[in-house]
Amino acid sequence: MLGASKIEVALVLVMGVFSAPSFLLMAASGGNADAAQKSAQQATLRPASASSPDIPFSDYDSGAEQLLLELANQSRAQAGAPRLTLDAGMSRAARAHAEQMFAERQLSHQFDGEPSLPQRLAAATSIQLDQEGENVALDFDAEKGHQHLMLSPPHRANLLNPAYNVVGLGVVRSGDRLYIVQDFGHALPNYSPAEVKDKIAAAVLQVRHDTKQPELARRDLSAADAAACSMAQADKLGTSPVHQLAQRYTVLTYTSLHPEALPENASHLLSSLNLHSFSVGTCYSRTETYPTGVYWVVLSLD
């Protein structure tokens, strides 16, 4: 199982003291909150065919890939899980990994010098994923491969995971053997920058409504966007532009995959009687810490 990208949250307070378990109080220096891990489920299956003699590489087997997709969706329908949509980029990543397994003559989720699964998928597709998983196998044909995968609990769990909605399939044929890679993911909606800001703003106003506080005025602040993009560029919270912004406002910074959801315990800060207005600054970016992308968010409050 691969460790997943962490989601960070930090709070810069100009005046007063605020304490909550899921936030980090910052003054002159930045820092990271505890990682909130998402999982990338991985499993490996090596049937008896793995011991047969090596046979030269033939080609990708698109027919086997299509059959594996159909069989997976049939099994998912029986289990009440949504259908998987084939993603061309994820399939390129799966094929490349299947060819690497053939070249190494072994099954693995990551060979020496090879990028991690999230990094491979990020390099191959433009869709934003918040979950990834992978099955690899070696078998004689696609139908038997699917049957064997379904008999293995961790592989079956990946195939039937209701959270997954996209898949990439790669099958390399080598004589009578198939090197099989199934890369699963949960693709998030593709929001415009304005939509992201609107969703965050709606969440802020909902907190005010739920806590029976007066509605905050929303204002545009270009410095908040600049601060958010500075965090994305630095791949960390608490950059110099954030601290400069914090000289004038109370600033909450965090990373998120879901703009409609505020950080845990943010309502404690947002329900303050002393607040009158807010602005939202965002920047979407793929970084080393977040290879499949994340929203960097700056909320300024006064």
Protein language model features and the residues they cover:
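Short, well-ordered surface patches within globular domains
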Residues: 37-40, 44, 48-120, 156, ...
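Signal peptide processing junction and immediate N-terminal pro/mature segment
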Residues: 22-39
